[in-house]
Structure formats: structure tokens, C-alpha cells
Amino acid sequence: MSSGGLLLLLGLLTLWEVLTPVSSKDRPKFCELPADIGPCEDFTGAFHYSPREHECIEFIYGGCKGNANNFNTLEECESACAA
């Protein structure tokens, strides 16, 4: 392979690495949990990571219990699960 072809291949691989989202094997297991409103009724907006949608989605949280796939802000959710 010529040096130009090798350089092109290296550039394409680098671009692919940058644009590829975090794979599920690198994502914490709690990010795969379903949204859980919890048993309380102090309803507030929260965010959870949706493995099906591959993004963080807002949902209504009851204010207690639930599970670890529950974040106060979109930024917290994306930092933990959707990087």
C-alpha cells in the first residue's frame, strides 16, 4: 500500500473513532436499566438513558427510590451514559 493510501486509511479510522458513540460494552450497566418513576408522588422532571433510542430522555420521576438510571440534568445523563 502506498504511503498516501495508508495515510488516507489512518485518517478514516481516526474519523470513525471520533464519530462512533460509546458502545454498550463501555457503558455502565445501570444505563441499561429502564426508567423507574419510583413509589413517591413528588413528581419532577428527570432524565434517563434509553438504550433503544441511544440517547438521554426526559421522564417524570416520583422523587424517591427508582434506580440508578436517573439524572437531574441532561448533561449528567449524557456524561454518564451517552458520552
UniProtKB/Swiss-Prot annotation:
Expressed by the venom gland. The keyword Transcription regulation does not apply. Residues 1-24 form the signal peptide. Keywords: Disulfide bond, Protease inhibitor, Secreted, Serine protease inhibitor, Signal. It holds the Pfam family Kunitz_BPTI. Its main location: secreted. It is found in: Secreted. Residues 31-81 form the BPTI/Kunitz inhibitor domain. One of its GO terms (molecular function) is serine-type endopeptidase inhibitor activity. One of its GO terms (cellular component) is extracellular region. Disulfide bonds join 31-81, 40-64, 56-77. The keyword Disulfide bond applies. SMART domains: KU (SM00131). PANTHER family: KUNITZ-TYPE PROTEASE INHIBITOR-RELATED. Serine protease inhibitor. Belongs to the venom Kunitz-type family. This is Kunitz-type serine protease inhibitor scutellin-3.
